């Protein structure tokens, strides 16, 4: 009803002006939320948020089906609101609602000819955490060339400045820390990035301290399964069992919420710079578009000055710039 009211108001303006100057298009936004504490037993992570997103995705799916009929029989449906829909997005704070939560919704809507965008890499416990979230968004949401990634600050901020501002100590929940360390180890192998010895020892100590005997490769495989519906996990492999525990083992989940003090060594800073560079190469090669929102990032305190914005790393006319990523400049202030 709200959309219909807005549509009628805009059409009224157009009729009064005898024009179509008040043009608009619709992008539906899923909203990331922190899961409320529930007394329910046997519920997966983000259970209530997932249920809400599923309901919303179902409603959008029905509307997009109508949109397809609009496009096919335009003369019969002229002015129908569904023909204004051009994209799907997910926004808001991402610390407690990772890309995996939206995987089924994006998959269900992927058959329609619309654009997809996902705000990611803006809120993070560590740059590595933000980079992992970007990687998961691309993988779990099956993003294609031309789809958009919102903000992606973790992809381009300067690690030395970031870590010095945090006094080289980061407070990170244990589950997030383990996942970040495993992701860094596996990506360094994939991208042929050398891990400094002290950093590698730190990674392995963190993983071995949490391990119940599984290999890191099995754990990483379980991380990649997080795009799958947690209600239909099964026990096909060791990775599936690890994924099942991730959702339904109460002791593991409780331990994962404990905040750890992560020490940032000088070698870690340079290592993260190398990982950032490799990921930027990946984004550039696959031609994802980065939505940059400088005024928003400075206004809400992510960055102190405009000249610190990573857009100058993503796409710069300066000599020596190694990247030319597709970017758009947006406000994001409204």
Across the structure, where does each feature detected by a protein language model lie?
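Metal-coordinating catalytic core of metallo-dependent amide/deamination hydrolases
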Residues: 1-100
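Histidine/acidic-residue-rich catalytic or RNA/ligand-binding cores of hydrolases
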Residues: 98, 102, 125-137, 157-168, ...
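Structural recognition of alpha->loop->beta junctions
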Residues: 60-88, 133-151, 312-329
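Flexible, acidic glycine-rich loops studded with aromatic residues
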Residues: 182-184, 208-234, 238, 304-334
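Long, low-complexity, polar/charged, intrinsically disordered or flexibly structured peripheral segments
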Residues: 57, 61-76, 191-277, 281, ...
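Generic long, charged, amphipathic alpha-helical segments
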Residues: 267-331
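Structural preference for beta-strand elements that scaffold enzyme active sites
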Residues: 23-27, 84-89, 115-117, 146-150, ...
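Short acidic/histidine-rich active-site segments
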Residues: 117-125, 148-152, 295, 323-334
